[in-house]
Amino acid sequence: MPEESSPRRTPQSIPYQDLPHLVNADGQYLFCRYWKPTGTPKALIFVSHGAGEHSGRYEELARMLMGLDLLVFAHDHVGHGQSEGERMVVSDFHVFVRDVLQHVDSMQKDYPGLPVFLLGHSMGGAIAILTAAERPGHFAGMVLISPLVLANPESATTFKVLAAKVLNLVLPNLSLGPIDSSVLSRNKTEVDIYNSDPLICRAGLKVCFGIQLLNAVSRVERALPKLTVPFLLLQGSADRLCDSKGAYLLMELAKSQDKTLKIYEGAYHVLHKELPEVTNSVFHEINMWVSQRTATAGTASPP
């Protein structure tokens, strides 16, 4: 494909022609990352990041999975990281799901016959759930870390939700304030890394994006009774961003025959960047779960 005379650039002014990327159905350029094992991959796994962050924050997890001979791939969602789009704005939450399916389809053309897994954190967990629900039987398994299933009861009271819907009609770009980084993790070093990361969106959650997150919660709740994909669900009991009750709801409603929940008492939201004893356990649980299912997945995922 010939490049434009004036090349498209990332929000950080890097030409996309110099970076791995895809162009979505709306013509937006999305920055991609790939972690490829040295040998022949056993499976593919797409990593779906959370709101306001980017795919680069999954480097350690991706390298661990790559060590299991998985080909790990990801992109920065629209409006995030090094992808195009107004920061933390999306016309409809389904755009995120559509883009994931586009990326998955592209990778399956290059690696036909390999099983495909999903891994999602927070908002990325909701994206993973909706992606799996849209294609029953397509995915070999799913790992969910503190997924968005229920809105935080403190921030989604009936009054606040009603107020947000009214504001969305008149002031959709009004900021509701930035994410409080202190509730992400008890690991102060990780919080400092988050605070100094130039690719993190610090503009604050806009009303219009908050509405899309509420829409996502509604769609996830409707999708759960139809969900049959095997999954591993990891959740912190002290998560103040994604209500831990959502984990129990997911376990109760999902029709999956193979489903596992592990609760980390006292842990916050970003379990893969928590206190060492939590994060080490998270990596171990994911390693064991994925290893067992790649050994038995075969060619479960159609092209």
UniProtKB/Swiss-Prot annotation:
Q: Gene that codes for this?
A: MGLL
Q: How is this protein annotated for GO cellular component? A: cytosol; endoplasmic reticulum membrane; membrane; plasma membrane
User: Which UniProt keyword terms apply here?
Assistant: Cytoplasm, Fatty acid biosynthesis, Fatty acid metabolism, Hydrolase, Lipid biosynthesis, Lipid degradation, Lipid metabolism, Membrane, Nitration, Phosphoprotein, Serine esterase
Pathway listed for it? Glycerolipid metabolism; triacylglycerol degradation
- What Pfam family is a match, any one? Hydrolase_4
The free-text tissue note of the record is: Detected in adipose tissue, lung, liver, kidney, brain and heart.
Q: What is this protein called?
A: Monoglyceride lipase
Q: Indicate the residues that form the catalytic site.
A: S122, D239, H269
Give residue numbers for the modification (Phosphothreonine).
T10
